[in-house]
Every structure is written in structure tokens, then in C-alpha cells.
Amino acid sequence: DGPPTKEEFQSRLNEKNVFKRHHAERMIARYERDGKLIAEYPYTIQILKIGDLTLIALAGEVVTDYALRLKRELGGDVWVAGYSNDLCSYIPSARMFKEGGYEVIDSMIYYDLPGPYKPELEERIIGKVHELARRLGVKATK
């Protein structure tokens, strides 16, 4: 259950959408150069505690669902900032995976990633935020 195969990208070379076609060309070139594509991306999460404020810095273009959930679950003064330390891609939420669409399926081509993230993305990110928050003494309310 990894990235699309080289053959899958070759089948996209006749794609009418120029961006999708160019993405397929880049992924084929990467297969030929490296013999494989990345199956995971190192995602940056940073948490700072400044007095009563907990600043959560998340990489990428994070959707509002993350901020709403973290504020609800961590309580207190929580500030969630996206575009922090890396602009890896659009970061969809679990709700969006159920809906599908551009952000979940197609946006990866503009960030030069081989394919969409997996539906458990939100849980992995939120879980790591909670782990880091506990280390700083932030107690979850939920």
C-alpha cells in the first residue's frame, strides 16, 4: 500500500491535464533515478509553552479542523499555526478523506509528492501533538 507504481504513472502520460501529465513525468524520472518513490514524508511538529499559551506549529497548509480539534482537546490558551517549518503540502483532515476531492486526491501533484496521504494522517499528527504536549506538562481536557 505504497506510492503508485511506475506503470501507473506511465498510464498518465496521455493525461489532458498538463499538471497531472508533468507530475507523471517527474515521478517516472524519479523512479528511473532512485529506483523507488518515497512512501512517507517526515512531518514537522513543534510545540512551545510560553506562560499559559501553548503554541503548536504544524508543517504544511493545515486545514482548520486541526486547530478546532486541538483547541477542544487541549483546552486553555492554544494557538495552532500552519505553514510552520515546512510547506510540504496541503494537510487534509479525516473529515476531508471521507469527502474526497482536490485537497485529498489531486493537490499532491503541485507539491511533487507521489500520491495522496493515507486516511490515518490526522490521527498520527494529533497523536504526536498530544505526546509532545504531555512532555511540556500540557494536560488534555479530552
Map each language-model feature to its residues:
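Non-catalytic substrate/cofactor recognition surfaces at enzyme active-site rims
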Residues: 1-142
